[in-house]
Amino acid sequence: MKYCMAIGLLGSMTLQAMAQYTGKVFVDENRNGLLDEGEKRLHRVSVSDGLNVVQTDSNGAYQLPGHSRMPFLFITTPSGYKTDNAYYYRIENGRTEYDFPVYPCYGGIQADGSHRFIHISDTEIRGKEGNQAWVDNLRDYSANEKIAFIVHTGDICYESGLNSHIGLLNTALMEDTQIFYGIGNHDLVKGAYGEELFEKLYGPVFYSFDVGNTHYIMTPMLHGDYLPEYTKEDVYRWMKNDLAYVGKEKSIIVFNHSLPEDTVAFKYGMSDTEYIDLPAMGLKAWLYGHWHVNHVHKHKVTGVYTICTSTPACGGIDHAPSAFRVLTVDTEGNVASEFRYSYLSPSLHIVSLEN
């Protein structure tokens, strides 16, 4: 999150905050990135400047004022659609119009909204070398089993990992699914501010998307190896506005690199009087990594699950083998979990029951 420190840039940032940003969300049938005559425009898609959230009108159009603490505009990717790593735009000086093309992506979403997704975390790679095997295994499984999306909850990690990982695993490489990334403590690296490189490669550190009857929210870890520019207040104020457009019929699942501060009532906010009551909003689960273990716990007071997943690349410190977690979400947002081991090549064994 780029918060301008140099006095010489304050003027342009002020103008950015005062700008009116407009655009449309549309189904890009020919995938040329342009809104062509006859292409469908999508109604009621949330669009945000990092603070304010609006929804597109019947013509697929939106208008936002801009926010000085966020250099992006981004959409809540609607269910049944995907973008090729482009659910966001970095705001450019002098440009005020940003159209968002989306493509149909119904694979893995059943008629009742139920679906499956894959959770990975803490891959902590140093480069592409030595990682293609587990990535291919993950991608092949996703394609064969019609997985709705893959989510990585951070620690990609350090400069070398951040630069390499996006080339190994991204939405453009997969035909009928998509991948979303979150930021971990080891993804806050040296630069003008901790999340600078992550933003350059992966986009905003908080955002949301819809799949079936579930609203998914990615949130950033609040501390790390280097100081981030974003604050909990930034995340809270955006999340509050984001959830204002989520109907009561939808369940909510939150992603983060670690556990929330409040694992009793799951209230996310600034104080005892200013917070979001996530269970009251429909929170079903909080998925995270960080601890390099596999752990599932249902909290008695709220019924919310906290689900930790280790790395698919080399196993966990709990001696768990390399694996990725497959989660099934039913029409009411209830979650079931299973594991699939990494590095397993396809094989067929023919046996005789008589011998």
Residue spans for each PLM region:
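Short acidic, glycine-rich surface-loop motifs adjacent to enzyme active sites
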Residues: 246-264
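A short C-terminal boundary segment appended to hydrolase-like catalytic domains
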Residues: 328-355
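Extended active-site neighborhood of metal-dependent phosphoesterases/phosphodiesterases
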Residues: 78-83, 90, 103, 163-246, ...
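A short, amphipathic beta-strand motif
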Residues: 21-27
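N-terminal active-site segment of His-dependent metallophosphoesterases
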Residues: 29, 90-164
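Active-site glycine-centered loops adjacent to acidic/histidine catalytic or metal-binding residues
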Residues: 122, 154-155, 184-185, 257, ...
